[in-house]
Amino acid sequence: MRGTSIAVLIISALVIAPAGCVNRTARSGTAPPSTCLKDLNAIPGMSAVLKSRKHDSQESQGRPFEGMEIALTINGMVMSDIDPEADADDQCFTENTPENLDRLAKALETNAMPPTMSFISGKWFDERMEKEWLKRGNLIGSLGYDRLRRRKSTAEQFIQDIARNDAVLAGLWGGSSPTRKYFRFPGTRPWRKNRNIDTVNAYLKKNRYTLVPATIDLLDASFSQLYCSALSRSDQSCSNLIRANFRTLALDTTLRARSIAKDQAGHDVKHILAVGANQFTCDNLSELLAWYKSLGARFIPLDEALLDPFYASANAAAVMQEARSAQLAAAEKR
């Protein structure tokens, strides 16, 4: 895609329709473009990115991700049944279906992806779906049972939460615990300055866990609610605008994470990308992966990414937050 600018990238997003989504009760009506854009700008970092990149296109020329090696990971997994008691404010309450797991798995298969790890919280554990995910050749890690907040939990509470999730996931291993297990701290803020981290890390190491931070977070969950709302009212213009803005944010976030990590490590590190198991991802993952590849990225297994010495330091966990801060700082300079 030589000579491609951000404008062209956005236009390409506008013409790509999702592969199909779970049927919803349609509500008539189309939101004015200004309303749709206003909702998008409320997403953390979105308005900052649009402002900072308004006059910049040089970074998007050619294949801006050329040379990047990225491992894809997924936070959570859709469940097998729609919850009839779901919060009325949850626009995506119908995302929990086997069809959406199939859509995620097919997106990986279509793009010849390596086995992809989904990090599971026991509170939302669905044995049928997790077993199907493994059956499709993918992997499962732990996100803790209840996704505890680091600032409101002691080390002992965190350890108990991890152990509780261990017990839930044990049913997936057929009676024999895997030789290597994977854990991701919930949330996006780094733990390196938290007084509890050493105690929790010692527990994880003792129990054969490998820590898996993410260096790139695309905030897809924030886009998903707006996307589901647009689909429910058959507002194709708004859903197209959502996808276009998502790619703009993805481009900016990925390039900033690459630059920050390279400055810290002294080399182009192998990155770990995190997306959520939500309706937006289910519908658009296949196109997103193809887009990353078209811009030069190569997807690699998670274990290969973790071999990068960068992940032996505490810096890796801070890259996401630093990229977000850099986006806001760039906008303020305009």
Whereabouts are the PLM-identified features?
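Bacterial N-terminal signal peptides
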Residues: 7-17
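Bacterial signal peptide processing site
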Residues: 22-23
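Active-site beta->alpha N-cap acidic-glycine motif
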Residues: 35-185, 288-291, 298, 305-307, ...
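Catalytic domains of cell-wall/extracellular-matrix polysaccharide-remodeling enzymes
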Residues: 124-132, 149-298, 304
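Structural recognition of alpha->loop->beta junctions
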Residues: 137, 206-207, 325-329
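Low-complexity, Gly/Ser/Thr/Pro-rich intrinsically disordered linker/tail segments
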Residues: 285-334
